[in-house]
């Protein structure tokens, strides 16, 4: 079991209950899922690019991503409806906690010129979204085997009612927000 999940059960629940005055442990915000999304618009020209993106995402997440397709045609981008333009994966349960641990302990410290994550990236409902410019910050990616540096979006979905509760939850896990 992931150590952050144990920390959540042992200390975070009590800490947040005390801070916000919850009467039941079911009221305490928790991380519901983590979604990784990689937009690969260049895959329209070359199918190999999408295969490489899926391979990278599988290595990072530990499960195979779903290839997302264009919903409608856009002539300006030379995209037709049904073309593969990205991939996404939703992590829940044990895999989610393991990924969250790797993100905090290994990946975020490896970001170049890192000065903390913006606290303004909450969506108003306690969910946090962040972007990563390069996939090589994850230890599962072999630098020599990548064809190009790709970024991705990481969304942490919580059961928090507002941004204040969501931030308190992530702060309890020592999430590196800008001061």
Swiss-Prot record:
Check the record and name the InterPro entries matching this protein.
Ribosomal_uL5 (IPR002132), Ribosomal_uL5_bac-type (IPR020930), Ribosomal_uL5_C (IPR031309), Ribosomal_uL5_CS (IPR020929), Ribosomal_uL5_dom_sf (IPR022803), Ribosomal_uL5_N (IPR031310)
The record's section on PROSITE patterns has: RIBOSOMAL_L5 (PS00358)
Pfam families per record: Ribosomal_L5, Ribosomal_L5_C
Superkingdom as given in the UniProt entry: Bacteria
Family label: Belongs to the universal ribosomal protein uL5 family.
What PANTHER family does the entry give?
60S RIBOSOMAL PROTEIN L11-RELATED
Instruction: Supply the name of the protein.
Output: Large ribosomal subunit protein uL5
